[in-house]
Amino acid sequence: MSERLVTSNEIGIDSTNEYSLRPEKINEYIGQDKVKERLNIFIKAAQRREEALDHVILYGPPGLGKTTLANIIANEMGGNLKITSGPAIERAGDLAAILTTLNTNDVLFIDEIHRLNRSVEEILYPAMEDYVLDIIIGKGAASKSIRLDLPKFTLIGATTRIGMLSSPLRDRLGVLCSMEYYTDEQLKEIIIRSAEILGCHITEEGAFEIAKRSRGTPRIANRLLKRVRDFAEVLYDNEITEEAAKKSLEILEVDGEGFDRIDNKILEAIIDNFNGGPVGIETLAYFVGEELDTIEDVYEPYLLQKGFIVRTPRGRMATDKAYKHLGRVRFNESKIDSKQCTLFEK
């Protein structure tokens, strides 16, 4: 199966020109205004005290710029960024090897920090609190503990599931930042900036057309820009206008809401096969031809967020927005009361 253009997870195309598109300083970073304001204050305060920035947790959906913010923090603090992930650190020794390579004001960025092994976490606690690393050399009766001093560094954890962090780890993270989806206007600014870096001419209308299909996510916006740029170079004299963006994205099967073929197939299944629902998730997955976990983790969250489906105790139901989007008429007069539905009922 080909890679999905509108997934917020990282795919192969994202590595192309990825770092050239990322801002280096906090005043270049577009969006997340509340997060930027707080971080800017904390960074300046740490600099004035000549201390390391307190440890940070960035949480929210994927693709919103957590790694970019970590890189900006490292640049602002005059340190280097070292990147790893929770699943990649399998043993305490793996983490110890990383910690001993850090220098003063370096930033250690751990993606998916909620997936850290608990034994690995225990190594982190004294490193975060006291900047020391306790290691045991030898085995059995001959073993001994050695304490190594570490430079003043900043740990930045990123997670899509803040509730899965252990309490001891969460208590040691002094700066909590919630990342939110971007507005279409903010994404338009990001797209215009990225187009300039890529050497592609784009109109404001063309940028907005891509922005509104980018699902509130900069990673998707930049990905769609790269693909639309290909069409512009071949078919539209290297200029992305509103019309060029529309036609290109139609060929890429990304509609005006940012839905792709499977998103629309889910809505069609609920409306056409089950009269708008309710329908159980297992049955829905069967009709769509996707794995149940894929429906729940990949496709459903955005449809819920946009208000095109709701979860009820009896299953998924399509809303009036879904009917309108597909050009269908609701023959069932019953209305969905969203207040009686919950995003967390299965």
Curated annotation (Swiss-Prot):
Residues 256-346 are annotated as: Head domain (RuvB-H). Keywords: ATP-binding, Cytoplasm, DNA damage, DNA recombination, DNA repair, DNA-binding, Hydrolase, Nucleotide-binding. Its main location: cytoplasm. DNA binds at R311, R316. One of its GO terms (molecular function) is four-way junction DNA binding. GO terms for biological process: DNA recombination; DNA repair. Residues 1-182 are annotated as: Large ATPase domain (RuvB-L). GO terms for cellular component: cytoplasm; Holliday junction resolvase complex. Mg(2+) binds at T67. The keyword DNA damage applies. Gene3D superfamilies: 1.10.8.60, P-loop containing nucleotide triphosphate hydrolases, Winged helix-like DNA-binding domain superfamily/Winged helix DNA-binding domain. It catalyses: ATP + H2O = ADP + phosphate + H(+). It comes from the Bacteria. Belongs to the RuvB family. HAMAP family: DNA_HJ_migration_RuvB. Has 3 domains, the large (RuvB-L) and small ATPase (RuvB-S) domains and the C-terminal head (RuvB-H) domain. The head domain binds DNA, while the ATPase domains jointly bind ATP, ADP or are empty depending on the state of the subunit in the translocation cycle. During a single DNA translocation step the structure of each domain remains the same, but their relative positions change. Homohexamer. Forms an RuvA(8)-RuvB(12)-Holliday junction (HJ) complex. HJ DNA is sandwiched between 2 RuvA tetramers; dsDNA enters through RuvA and exits via RuvB. An RuvB hexamer assembles on each DNA strand where it exits the tetramer. Each RuvB hexamer is contacted by two RuvA subunits (via domain III) on 2 adjacent RuvB subunits; this complex drives branch migration. In the full resolvosome a probable DNA-RuvA(4)-RuvB(12)-RuvC(2) complex forms which resolves the HJ. This is Holliday junction branch migration complex subunit RuvB. It comes from Clostridium perfringens (strain 13 / Type A). The lineage of its organism: Bacteria, Bacillati, Bacillota, Clostridia, Eubacteriales.
